[in-house]
């Protein structure tokens, strides 16, 4: 799989970008702040419908523009697919597949499969559980695009149930049973949708764990072994069925009903889960050194890459300024993986950040002041 063409309109610092890409290695070179990361971010957005840098879409639209458009042409086993994503503030985003509108942008998920390495990856180890849940859900969705719908349904249920919990607390003291009966209905919705999401995550971690262990040994031979485990907010065994999770969620919500009403928040469900990262007998978060944290973060991405490769065609590798963050051993390990990928798209502040033996096409990025303000440009 590779991206043959990338077009941007009013995306971040790019008023317009029109790039012909090819298999192999391509390096976008330019000083920090010139917009090279925005190119990688656009490709990641096309693959996942999300940014690796911000939680909302609004910052992706260039200042003063009404919308941003990301268009890609992806080639997979000789077949071309064109994806257009239109990002608009305050309105639902739109998508087209082969120039035809689709009902939801989620319908284009799976066209571009990618794995991103970025400086932000350190948050996978040192950040809060939400970072690790997002990693799992993005990877699960890349493997099975239908998971995006499961996650969207679950998020909707959480919003509705949280609002109901806030109002139900007062209703209980007024003796209003109708609100509590409605809460029972939403308990069922949370259990049904949450169980599907938890089962998908557990299945993913089951397949991911041996790949993480192997990747960490590659990056840090002789170090403590790395291990991962899906830790839920309920008492559940590893790698169980959706039916088991559904029953366990219903039981947990019954037991924690008073606490949820008192606090007005959902205390049970996959939004409270975590991906446990361990080095030897210690948790990586709080105990891993800076180098060990980087090795663990890279191991999670390398494992994702290997898992997607076993599913089918090679995913596109996106390397956002990571070589500058790594020591020599980790640079070599990452370069070895990149050597076998069908397409690698890399950003670097200076050409010296790229391995010296790489045969790579280089695209220089600059900034220019014009009628659109300060915008990113490709040097001709």
Curated annotation (Swiss-Prot):
<comment type="function">
    <text>The RecF protein is involved in DNA metabolism; it is required for DNA replication and normal SOS inducibility. RecF binds preferentially to single-stranded, linear DNA. It also seems to bind ATP.</text>
</comment>
<dbReference type="InterPro" id="IPR001238">
    <property type="entry name" value="DNA-binding_RecF"/>
</dbReference>
<dbReference type="GO" id="GO:0005737">
    <property type="term" value="C:cytoplasm"/>
</dbReference>
<dbReference type="InterPro" id="IPR027417">
    <property type="entry name" value="P-loop_NTPase"/>
</dbReference>
<keyword id="KW-0234">DNA repair</keyword>
<comment type="similarity">
    <text>Belongs to the RecF family.</text>
</comment>
<dbReference type="GO" id="GO:0000731">
    <property type="term" value="P:DNA synthesis involved in DNA repair"/>
</dbReference>
<keyword id="KW-0238">DNA-binding</keyword>
<dbReference type="InterPro" id="IPR018078">
    <property type="entry name" value="DNA-binding_RecF_CS"/>
</dbReference>
<dbReference type="GO" id="GO:0006260">
    <property type="term" value="P:DNA replication"/>
</dbReference>
<keyword id="KW-0067">ATP-binding</keyword>
<keyword id="KW-0742">SOS response</keyword>
<dbReference type="GO" id="GO:0006302">
    <property type="term" value="P:double-strand break repair"/>
</dbReference>
<dbReference type="Pfam" id="PF02463">
    <property type="entry name" value="SMC_N"/>
</dbReference>
<protein>
    <recommendedName>
        <fullName>DNA replication and repair protein RecF</fullName>
    </recommendedName>
</protein>
<keyword id="KW-0963">Cytoplasm</keyword>
<dbReference type="InterPro" id="IPR042174">
    <property type="entry name" value="RecF_2"/>
</dbReference>
<keyword id="KW-0547">Nucleotide-binding</keyword>
<keyword id="KW-0227">DNA damage</keyword>
<feature type="binding site">
    <location>
        <begin position="30"/>
        <end position="37"/>
    </location>
    <ligand>
        <name>ATP</name>
    </ligand>
</feature>
<dbReference type="InterPro" id="IPR003395">
    <property type="entry name" value="RecF/RecN/SMC_N"/>
</dbReference>
<dbReference type="GO" id="GO:0009432">
    <property type="term" value="P:SOS response"/>
</dbReference>
<dbReference type="GO" id="GO:0005524">
    <property type="term" value="F:ATP binding"/>
</dbReference>
<keyword id="KW-0235">DNA replication</keyword>
<dbReference type="GO" id="GO:0003697">
    <property type="term" value="F:single-stranded DNA binding"/>
</dbReference>
């Amino acid at each position: 799989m590779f991206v043959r063409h990338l077009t941007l309109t009013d995306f971040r610092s790019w008023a317009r970008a029109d790039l012909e890409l090819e298999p192999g290695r391509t390096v976008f070179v330019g000083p920090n702040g010139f917009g090279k990361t925005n190119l990688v971010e656009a490709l990641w957005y096309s693959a996942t419908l999300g940014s690796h840098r911000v939680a909302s879409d609004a910052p992706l639209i260039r200042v003063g523009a009404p919308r941003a458009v990301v268009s890609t042409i992806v080639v997979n086993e000789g077949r071309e697919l064109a994806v257009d994503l239109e990002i608009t503030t305050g309105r639902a985003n739109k998508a087209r597949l082969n120039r035809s509108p689709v009902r939801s942008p989620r319908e284009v998920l799976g066209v571009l499969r990618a794995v991103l390495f970025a400086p932000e990856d350190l948050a996978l180890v040192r950040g809060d559980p939400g970072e690790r849940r997002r990693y799992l859900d993005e990877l699960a969705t890349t493997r099975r695009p239908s998971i995006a719908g499961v996650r969207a349904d679950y998020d909707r249920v959480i919003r509705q149930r949280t609002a109901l919990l806030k109002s139900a607390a007062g209703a209980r003291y007024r003796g209003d049973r109708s609100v509590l009966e409605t809460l029972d209905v939403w308990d069922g919705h949370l259990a049904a949708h949450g169980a599907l999401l938890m089962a998908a995550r557990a299945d993913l971690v089951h397949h991911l764990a041996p790949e993480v262990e192997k990747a960490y040994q590659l990056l840090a031979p002789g170090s403590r072994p790395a291990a991962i485990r899906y830790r839920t907010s309920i008492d559940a065994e590893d790698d169980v069925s959706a039916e088991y999770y559904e029953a366990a969620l219903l039981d947990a919500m019954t037991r924690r009903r008073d606490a949820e009403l008192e606090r007005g928040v959902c205390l049970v469900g996959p939004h409270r889960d975590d991906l446990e990262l361990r080095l030897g007998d210690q948790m990586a978060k709080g105990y891993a050194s800076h180098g060990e944290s980087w090795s663990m973060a890279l191991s999670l991405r390398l494992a994702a890459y290997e898992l997607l490769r076993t599913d089918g065609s090679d995913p596109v590798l996106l390397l956002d300024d990571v070589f500058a963050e790594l020591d020599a051993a980790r640079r070599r390990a990452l370069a070895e993986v990149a050597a076998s990928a069908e397409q690698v798209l890399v950003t670097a502040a200076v050409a010296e950040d790229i391995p010296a033996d790489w045969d790579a096409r280089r695209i220089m990025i600059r900034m220019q002041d014009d009628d659109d303000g300060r915008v990113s440009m490709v040097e001709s």
